[in-house]
Structure formats: structure tokens, C-alpha cells
């Protein structure tokens, strides 16, 4: 299956473009979670942690999830955004807000 992130080093380049994260500038980092939406939303009721920016509305998943980490390569410049694709199984941290409380 050539479409899975693990076998496709171009995954991030395609997905970042499709999700409009390369319009106007290159978004430097993005993580895609390959889990059911309900499982990602459930993280908002799991372990509360402090966000990187100091906010207190972040939560860490109880279990490892399948993710793809996309990071802009050092040599890429807008409009030719290029990304390194890394697949991993790890606990994710999401910021949550609203009612119902959902990832943002």
C-alpha cells in the first residue's frame, strides 16, 4: 500500500499542501494522528499537562497513537515548502477548548 505514511516519504509534502498549511508561508511543523476522531477527542478527558506555551488546557493521551510528524526541511523556502516525514507511535498532547471540550 503505497499510500500509507510509513512507505511514502512524500506524505507530508502532499498533506501539508492539501490541508492548506503552505499558503502564504510554510507551516514549520505539523503532526497528523492516524486514529479515529473519537479516540483523539477522548484525549481531552485524559491526563492534564501544561502546554508548551504555558497554557493549562493541554492533555496527554493515555496510550501511544499512530502519528506522522512533518517538519520543514532546513533548505526549503516558501513557496517551495518541503517536509521530512517521520512516522511514530507515541503519546500525543492536544490543546482542548469549547463545550463539548474538543482538541483545537
Curated annotation (Swiss-Prot):
Its EC number is 4.6.1.18. Pfam families: RnaseA. It is found in: Secreted. Substrate binds at residues 27-31, 52, 71. CDD domains: RNase_A_canonical. Disulfide bonds join 12-70, 26-81, 44-96, 51-58. One of its GO terms (biological process) is defense response to Gram-positive bacterium. Keywords: Disulfide bond, Endonuclease, Hydrolase, Lyase, Nuclease, Secreted. It catalyses: an [RNA] containing cytidine + H2O = an [RNA]-3'-cytidine-3'-phosphate + a 5'-hydroxy-ribonucleotide-3'-[RNA]; an [RNA] containing uridine + H2O = an [RNA]-3'-uridine-3'-phosphate + a 5'-hydroxy-ribonucleotide-3'-[RNA]. GO terms for cellular component: extracellular region. The keyword Repressor does not apply. Signal peptide: none annotated. It is an enzyme of class 4 (lyase). One of its GO terms (molecular function) is nucleic acid binding. Homodimer; disulfide-linked. Belongs to the pancreatic ribonuclease family. This is Seminal ribonuclease. The gene is SRN.
Amino acid at each position: 500500500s503505497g499510500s500509507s505514511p510509513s512507505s511514502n516519504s512524500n506524505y507530508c509534502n502532499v498533506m501539508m499542501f492539501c490541508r492548506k498549511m503552505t499558503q502564504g508561508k510554510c507551516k514549520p511543523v505539523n503532526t497528523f494522528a492516524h486514529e479515529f476522531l473519537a479516540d483523539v477527542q477522548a484525549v481531552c478527558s485524559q491526563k492534564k499537562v501544561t502546554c508548551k506555551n504555558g497554557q493549562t488546557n493541554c492533555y496527554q493521551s493515555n496510550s501511544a497513537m499512530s502519528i506522522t510528524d512533518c517538519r520543514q526541511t532546513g533548505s526549503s523556502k516558501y513557496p517551495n515548502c518541503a517536509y521530512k516525514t517521520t512516522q511514530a507511535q507515541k503519546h500525543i498532547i492536544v490543546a482542548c477548548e469549547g463545550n463539548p471540550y474538543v482538541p483545537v
